[in-house]
UniProtKB/Swiss-Prot annotation:
Induction: Induced by osmotic shock (0.8 M NaCl) and by heat shock (52 degrees Celsius).
GO biological process, one term: sporulation
A Pfam family this chain is assigned to: FtsH_ext
Topological domains, Cytoplasmic: 1-7, 131-637
Residue numbers binding Zn(2+): H423, H427, D499
Described purpose of this protein according to its UniProt entry: Acts as a processive, ATP-dependent zinc metallopeptidase for both cytoplasmic and membrane proteins. Plays a role in the quality control of integral membrane proteins.
PROSITE patterns in the record: AAA
Annotated source species: Bacillus subtilis (strain 168)
TM ranges: 8-28, 110-130
Gene Ontology MF, one: ATP-dependent peptidase activity
Protein name per the record: ATP-dependent zinc metalloprotease FtsH
Residues bound to ATP: G201, P202, P203, G204, T205, G206, K207, T208
Cofactor names: Zn(2+)
Active site: E424
Amino acid sequence: MNRVFRNTIFYLLILLVVIGVVSYFQTSNPKTENMSYSTFIKNLDDGKVDSVSVQPVRGVYEVKGQLKNYDKDQYFLTHVPEGKGADQIFNALKKTDVKVEPAQETSGWVTFLTTIIPFVIIFILFFFLLNQAQGGGSRVMNFGKSKAKLYTEEKKRVKFKDVAGADEEKQELVEVVEFLKDPRKFAELGARIPKGVLLVGPPGTGKTLLAKACAGEAGVPFFSISGSDFVEMFVGVGASRVRDLFENAKKNAPCLIFIDEIDAVGRQRGAGLGGGHDEREQTLNQLLVEMDGFSANEGIIIIAATNRADILDPALLRPGRFDRQITVDRPDVIGREAVLKVHARNKPLDETVNLKSIAMRTPGFSGADLENLLNEAALVAARQNKKKIDARDIDEATDRVIAGPAKKSRVISKKERNIVAYHEGGHTVIGLVLDEADMVHKVTIVPRGQAGGYAVMLPREDRYFQTKPELLDKIVGLLGGRVAEEIIFGEVSTGAHNDFQRATNIARRMVTEFGMSEKLGPLQFGQSQGGQVFLGRDFNNEQNYSDQIAYEIDQEIQRIIKECYERAKQILTENRDKLELIAQTLLKVETLDAEQIKHLIDHGTLPERNFSDDEKNDDVKVNILTKTEEKKDDTKE
């Protein structure tokens, strides 16, 4: 926006200057009429001449004057040759009362400027237009210059205190900070500080924030660049930018260089369909040389971030280059609470907001997810003109982050509403009965995003690995919705397609990756689906098992799904009263949280408090007998 404004102002100034110069010349040059010598003599004899000025110009006399009937800005101009003609005019002027005014001498500078100014204006305008066409300045010559941004200001530096939920990761980077502050301490002991630190982890876990905090704590210049900024369409530009980056870093040493998304330039050489990318490989080669080549780069530490460390070139990860890898994972419940406290500093929270409870309800959330959750809560509160963010705003924000905004205006038929209620009720009952299944933290039949309703099924605690019974119970929980539809309505709908997708994926990984098939044994088959595929490397990978094994894999997956389906059917049949109670309550209040579900199962009623903005507790009390009878009436209709 600023650049557009500056360009507009520049063009306006150029236009005003041109208009001013043209106006000046037009106003400074009065109307002049060329008059012949004979006519001038006749007018002079007739007494029509009022005033004249005579000025010698290049061998003639330039006579400029006004007739008595002329306007104020009207003049005549005639030229008189030297000699008798001039003497005749001078003698005639002496005999008349014509005013002879001294000639106005024009300064040489004025003449020069009036001649040169139009050319200067044209040149400046042409130069500016050429500048714009080239993208500014000597852009063609600057292709090889680094695009890294240098941060040296002391204000608004990120510190380690601004990074929460990554205590171990921060500790790993403390050595880097100490080296930048006091390198002699390490040199005296013969220690070599890591030249490169690679931050690996899922998106949104704070890799870039950790790098900024490292530079902020050390108080040194901080160069920031993205991996995609190196490679351009022109050959050799990437390598040139790498050289220029390290040249600038040497001038500002000690310093930090942060390369975000380094996999854009550091992926394996020679990989890719149709061969490698020569320009990218040339850039990578130059980066390898600069990091650990013949010329030492003392005082320069490189921090890079990626979420695809599996595709990086091995030469980039060897000791002497990125010889320290720090895994920045999603925070656990304690880390999530710490992250929430950091992002809640500038937000007024109501006393009903419990950050620890929010942390327990958000397993798997990254730091960016938690920041977005609190920001959404602030937006929800502001939309309702509240002064503080309360627990309801947090709940609404959590739902928006997980499933999208509520579609309260969507028109849903009574039949579809019943199907959704019993579908979500099936998930809920399975979560209540099975100890190893994911627990339902919230269930609703309010449409959100693409879903007609949803149940928030989360692990009971943070898990870093899962047992076979846990995985089987998870599949049973996913199938609970479809089974409930079949038991209650005797028919099934398309609402369970996502449940089937997730359940099938778990069963397939149990058989092909985790070795949990009794028939096939502890073997792994094919490409691990837990890791991401790199097409250039994995395209030509052949199937490492026979067609017979492939058939047996399919049979094992079907067996697991069928057994879990039958198990879910048995559980819901035995607990049909709970299914009816939860489904009918959902049809009345639309949304239930974990506390309400527990109280409903234990006492047959909802707890004595408001559950929605529209309904009071007295209006939503239900019991098993009443709701079962209502269901029978509905099915008769």
